């Protein structure tokens, strides 16, 4: 009987650990309103027909950020943007998955990081990866200092940030940026979904880790 009880106890622990490790995806945007979010300028964000929309027509930008903060996670989002739009997904305070066309410098999928020496940890110059004014799928893996981005299933970069080179942020809110500037007047970025999945330290990414061109 003691052996059976021990077996059941160990099995329960293993099952519980597996369930915890395989945390389910949870929506950050509920498709109805901006509950759980706060904006620096609420006039630049709205929910319409189940979609989260960020826009500016006056040259002034704004951020919309979650009330909650996150450390180890995967984030996936479905979005489309206008051609001259400049936006991005903030995470861990000042890391950003860029959503823009700023050629010849970079395109959507760049890892914008103003606290690093080069401003970008990596860039994207492949124009075929994003569809302007159509739905696109972005995904972020942030576990410890390791960051990976995907755009429409293609991996854009996989970097373990070096504290000797980069200013490291361990956690922070998730945010949507509407970039300021007259050049971006009339811009709009639209999100159909923004989902998050908590990770344990060291959990592997759910997407393939293969760099474009390999």
Placement of each model-derived feature along the sequence:
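Bacterial N-terminal signal peptides that target proteins for export
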Residues: 1-10
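Carbohydrate-interacting regions of secretory-pathway proteins
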Residues: 21-214
């Amino acid at each position: 009987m003691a052996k059976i009880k021990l077996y059941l106890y160990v099995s329960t622990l293993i099952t519980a650990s597996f369930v915890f490790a395989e945390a389910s995806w949870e929506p950050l945007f509920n498709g109805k309103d901006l509950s759980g979010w706060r904006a620096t300028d609420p006039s630049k964000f709205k929910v319409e027909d189940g979609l989260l929309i960020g826009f500016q027509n006056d040259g002034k930008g704004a951020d919309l950020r979650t009330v909650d903060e996150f450390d180890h996670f995967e984030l996936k989002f479905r979005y489309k943007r206008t051609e001259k739009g400049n936006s991005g997904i903030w995470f861990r305070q000042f890391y950003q998955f860029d959503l823009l066309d700023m050629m010849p410098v970079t395109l959507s999928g760049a890892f914008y990081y103003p606290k690093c020496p080069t401003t970008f940890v990596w860039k994207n110059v492949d124009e075929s990866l994003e569809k302007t004014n159509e739905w696109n799928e972005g995904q972020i893996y942030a576990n410890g200092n390791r960051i990976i981005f995907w755009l429409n299933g293609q991996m854009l970069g996989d970097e373990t940030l070096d504290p000797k080179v980069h200013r490291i942020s361990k956690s922070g809110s998730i945010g949507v940026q509407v970039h300021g500037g007259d050049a971006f007047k009339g811009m709009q970025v639209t999100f159909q979904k923004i989902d998050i999945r908590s990770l344990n330290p060291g959990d592997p990414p759910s997407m393939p880790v293969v760099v474009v061109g390999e």
